[in-house]
Amino acid sequence: MKKLYFVFAALTIAAMTLSACAPAPEPVSEPAPAIEVPTDAAIVEEPVPVEPEAVSLWTQEYITQVPPIMMIEPYFAIFGQTAGPVPYYYEEAVKLAGHSCGATAGAWTITKKALEVLYPNGEIPVRGQIHVDAPGAEDEWFVGVFGDIIMYITGAAPKTGFNGSEFAVNDLYVRQNKMVYSEEPTGQLPPMREWIFTRLDTGAKVGVKFNLVIITPLPTPARAEMGKKVALGQATPEEAADYIQYWNDRARFVFENQDVDGFFTVTIYE
């Protein structure tokens, strides 16, 4: 009996030893939380580029508000540079003259009124198809200034203009001597000076006079003296501001009153 007890005890101890030496069960890790994947891919919208606003450097708004004169330039067509008529803007004429004034506004309007007669019913005028006779010598009074602006629009140039080169086989491409000044000063008073425009393909002819003496504000000796002070930089800020207003009001007057009777006289010649 005692022997059986010892055998039982030995077996019990051996079982306990084996149990103690057995490796502990590995911990079961919990499954990681599922990551939600959006069914629709996020749409990234690219910012729409914003066009910068055109900034005008002109401080006198009327300069850019004058309607353009549409013209056909035959040279543009044969060189493949445009597909149709091109606008000619008053602001470009101002750049050419170096300033805007009653005279530049008058030259622009003289040309506009002449072309409306020569090319009626919405017909687009053609550069190089117009001959202009100036009312005086190019260095007399402001005749040359008027002529420069008229040339810019019509293409009619004095002897300094393009002679056409190989393209001169078609008179449209000749610009030289289509603006003719008198050889000697005429001495005419400005309101009596008549610019004669001739359409070369039809022979239609129109004259335009510009009665600039009715422009207001009126020029005075005091205004002339102030102009000298402005040019010398001697005018006070208040004087300069007043002179600027006076000067540009005269140009505005031309555009705003161009259809007043007696301001621009248009004569159609048969």
Regions found by a protein language model. Name each.
Residues 28-50:
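Post-signal peptide N-terminal segment of mature Sec-exported envelope proteins
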Residues 15-20:
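C-terminal motif of bacterial Sec signal peptides marking the signal peptidase cleavage site
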Residues 45-98, 109-270:
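Non-transmembrane, aqueous-exposed alpha-helical and coiled segments at domain scale
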Residues 22-24:
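Bacterial signal peptide processing site
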Residues 6-13:
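Sec-dependent N-terminal signal peptides
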Residues 1-5:
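Positively charged n-region of N-terminal signal peptides that target proteins for export
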